[in-house]
């Protein structure tokens, strides 16, 4: 089984948290709301990976003013690729508290939508199990 280290930013701006709705045809949690993030590449430092994933998935205009390592977790997930292939992967999640100076987001093809959500509204979203676990641990659910 392949192992991946995943960096996940929990991005907050003015009391709201950024959620992204996964594309219906790919990823570990197709069609559900999630935190952004992705895999650390060989030779890449953790914060470099986090900043790269944010640029790739959320665009160049989203400006982070704070990045603080927060917690980690792990599990085994089945990933679905755009071509329909499936793969079981051991995932290690490194989760960061992040604060953004703005809300200028331009999502890539991995997502179909995004939202800035106040803590009291988070429970109204179809959150994937990993995001739900993270938000509970943070005391937001």
Curated annotation (Swiss-Prot):
Its EC number is 3.6.1.9, 3.6.1.12, 3.6.1.-, 3.6.1.23. A motif (Nudix box) lies at residues 38-59. One of its GO terms (molecular function) is dUTP diphosphatase activity. Keywords: Hydrolase, Magnesium. SUPFAM superfamilies: Nudix. It catalyses: a ribonucleoside 5'-triphosphate + H2O = a ribonucleoside 5'-phosphate + diphosphate + H(+); a 2'-deoxyribonucleoside 5'-triphosphate + H2O = a 2'-deoxyribonucleoside 5'-phosphate + diphosphate + H(+); dUTP + H2O = dUMP + diphosphate + H(+); dTTP + H2O = dTMP + diphosphate + H(+). Gene3D superfamilies: Nucleoside Triphosphate Pyrophosphohydrolase. Monomer. Belongs to the Nudix hydrolase family. NudI subfamily. Catalyzes the hydrolysis of nucleoside triphosphates, with a preference for pyrimidine deoxynucleoside triphosphates (dUTP, dTTP and dCTP). This is Nucleoside triphosphatase NudI.
């Amino acid at each position: 089984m392949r192992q991946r280290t995943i960096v996940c930013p929990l991005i907050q701006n003015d009391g709201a948290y950024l959620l992204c709705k996964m594309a219906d045809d790919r990823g570990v949690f197709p069609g559900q709301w999630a935190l952004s993030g992705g895999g650390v590449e060989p030779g890449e430092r953790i914060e470099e990976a986090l900043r790269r994933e944010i640029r790739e998935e959320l665009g160049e205009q989203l400006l982070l003013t704070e990045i603080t390592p927060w917690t980690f977790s792990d599990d085994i997930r089945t990933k679905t690729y755009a071509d329909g292939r499936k793969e079981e992967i051991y995932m290690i999640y490194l989760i960061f508290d992040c604060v953004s100076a703005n809300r200028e987001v331009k999502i890539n093809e991995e997502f179909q939508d995004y939202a800035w959500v106040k803590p009291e509204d988070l429970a109204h979203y179809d959150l994937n199990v990993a995001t739900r676990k993270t938000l509970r641990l943070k005391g937001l659910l």
